[in-house]
Design a protein with these regions (language model features):
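Noncatalytic alpha-helical scaffold of FAD-dependent oxidoreductases
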Residues: 1-249
Length: 249
């Protein structure tokens, strides 16, 4: 399935295989989480973050699935340290085009499939299960917005931060020809409740207010977010869709 491709003419006579019910988290241990392929990023975040654990390099939206992340070579704002999502996969199961079910694909078992799956977007087979690494985290992050008018200064500072790897998360924005922003986020152990920008889940007002562009446009210096809100800051309704109706100027 996926966007506007699901009803294309060439698919009319094809056999549809429904995978939406592969949505169970199978097990969570200290260093890994094992899921069926249609488990979403949002499901994972809400199970692991309360345990002070997270999957590195998840894309920043709540409805991406782990199977889609693996086939699509996903990444996030801590990928500059941890690599792509695929670099943090322990093993996975896949049904190939000839019907074979290949289990426990890893760096040492069917390594051709392990290293070849990224960027295939479902053409190699149907992923049914994915086991991912877990790393330590905190429940909150402090986000700093570093604003620049000079591209050279912006680029120099961004390059240095990437090299030093001191930030837990980092991304950068070119807002206009002479307006640039580095956005870095770091875990914090404690924060006062009144300092947290958003505390309510699935609220349109939350989604509107926490949009990273809103903070940049308002020239914020910093704010605090729950880690789950930061990790899902580009969820579809929050970012891709809502901006079309009321864009920030």
């Amino acid at each position: 399935k996926g966007h506007n491709h699901r009803d294309l003419q060439f698919k009319i006579k094809q056999t549809k295989i429904e995978t939406a019910q592969l949505d169970s988290i199978l097990s969570i241990e200290k260093d890994w989480i094992d899921c069926e392929a249609s488990v979403s990023v949002g499901q994972i975040n809400r199970k692991t973050i309360p345990k002070k654990k997270m999957v590195p390099s998840l894309p920043e939206g709540d409805n991406f699935t782990v199977g889609g992340c693996l086939g699509g070579l996903a990444l996030g704002s801590n990928s500059y340290i941890h690599g792509f999502f695929n670099n943090n996969v322990v093993d996975f199961d896949i049904v190939l085009g000839n019907g074979d079910l290949v289990r426990n694909v890893s760096k040492k078992n069917h390594s051709d499939l392990y290293y070849g799956i990224g960027g295939t977007y479902g053409t190699m087979g149907i992923i049914t299960r994915v086991k991912m690494k877990l790393i330590d985290c905190e429940s909150y992050v402090k986000i700093n917005y570093l604003h620049y008018k000079s591209f050279n200064e912006f680029y120099s500072d961004f390059s240095l931060r990437i090299k030093e790897q001191k930030d837990d998360f980092i991304e950068a924005f070119v807002n206009s020809k002479n307006d640039f922003t580095i956005v870095c986020a770091n875990f914090v152990k404690k924060v006062r409740k009144e300092e947290i920008l958003i505390i309510k889940d699935k609220s349109i007002l939350k989604q509107r207010h926490m949009c990273i562009y809103a903070q940049i446009a308002n020239k914020k210096d910093f704010n605090y977010l729950r880690l789950v809100d930061y990790l899902e800051r580009y969820s579809y309704s929050a970012f891709w869709g809502h901006y079309l109706y009321t864009p920030y100027k």
